[in-house]
């Protein structure tokens, strides 16, 4: 288990209050990167909130507490009402069916608001009143927020899940794109499905105590829920993230070390 020394994002917000826009954006970009990673691997968190977002010694966000998470299956919907009330989507507190990603998007919208404002968009000590506020989707918008980020928050806090922004729309939003580190969303490089990474296969074998032929068979089966295949693709993705991060650090090093321009 990884030790994360920076504490909860919640405590950071309590200590610092509303964050500067550039800092809020940096945290939010990392959160969306992590949520996107979960969704691409068919996992919906369902309890995203600052208390479940941890900070490491470099102030990088780590998503934690997957106790209420669930696997997404094609054509199937979820109904369980779970998560923290202040961050729960309208369809969740109403007991309606939901696919999964859209409820995480709502929670991320609440988190973004909290980062920028130091308060919650929907809050009340009386839970029924809180639920009524959430279902209306009406929340105060401070005058100091710029129009771009207000537009993004409003897209994420749409009561109708069909009108709510999805991950791809968030990633393409002009506010989100500012100073976006390339390693958070590595470019999708199409790989030859016939080429199998032997290092990743060996790592799966070591972790699960299986033979390489079993991993090969799992990959050939193309079963999206096979644990060996999932582990293999997670290893490949992690390596891709690490490679992109290393490139970014090297680029930053050369930029920082460049001589100043002549005046």
PLM regions: where:
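Eukaryotic serine/threonine protein kinase catalytic domain
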Residues: 1-180
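A short, hydrophobic secondary-structure junction motif
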Residues: 111, 259-260
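C-terminal regulatory tails of eukaryotic serine/threonine kinases
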Residues: 162, 168-259
């Amino acid at each position: 288990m990884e030790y994360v020394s920076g504490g909860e994002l919640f405590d950071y917000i309590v200590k610092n209050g509303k964050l500067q826009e550039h800092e809020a954006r940096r945290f939010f970009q990392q959160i969306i990167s992590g949520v996107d990673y979960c969704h691409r691997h068919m996992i919906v968190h369902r309890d995203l909130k600052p208390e479940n977002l941890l900070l490491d010694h470099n102030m990088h966000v780590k998503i934690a507490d997957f106790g209420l998470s669930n696997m997404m299956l094609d054509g199937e919907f979820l109904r369980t009402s779970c998560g923290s009330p202040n961050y729960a989507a309208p369809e969740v507190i109403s007991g309606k069916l939901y696919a999964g990603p859209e409820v995480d998007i709502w929670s991320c919208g609440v988190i973004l608001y909290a980062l920028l404002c130091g308060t919650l968009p929907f809050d009340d000590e009386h839970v029924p009143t809180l639920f009524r506020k959430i279902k209306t989707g009406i929340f105060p918008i401070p005058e100091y927020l710029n129009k771009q980020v207000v537009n993004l928050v409003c897209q994420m806090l749409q009561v109708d899940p069909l009108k709510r922004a999805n991950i791809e729309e968030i990633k393409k939003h002009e506010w989100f794109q500012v100073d976006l580190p390339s390693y958070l969303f590595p470019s999708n490089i199409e790989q030859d499905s016939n080429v199998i990474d032997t290092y990743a296969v060996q790592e799966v074998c070591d972790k699960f105590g299986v033979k390489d032929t079993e991993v090969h068979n799992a990959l050939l089966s193309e079963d999206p829920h096979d644990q060996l295949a999932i582990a293999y693709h997670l290893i490949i993705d992690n390596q891709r993230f690490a490679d992109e991060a290393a490139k970014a650090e090297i680029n930053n090093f050369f930029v920082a070390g460049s001589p100043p321009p002549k005046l």
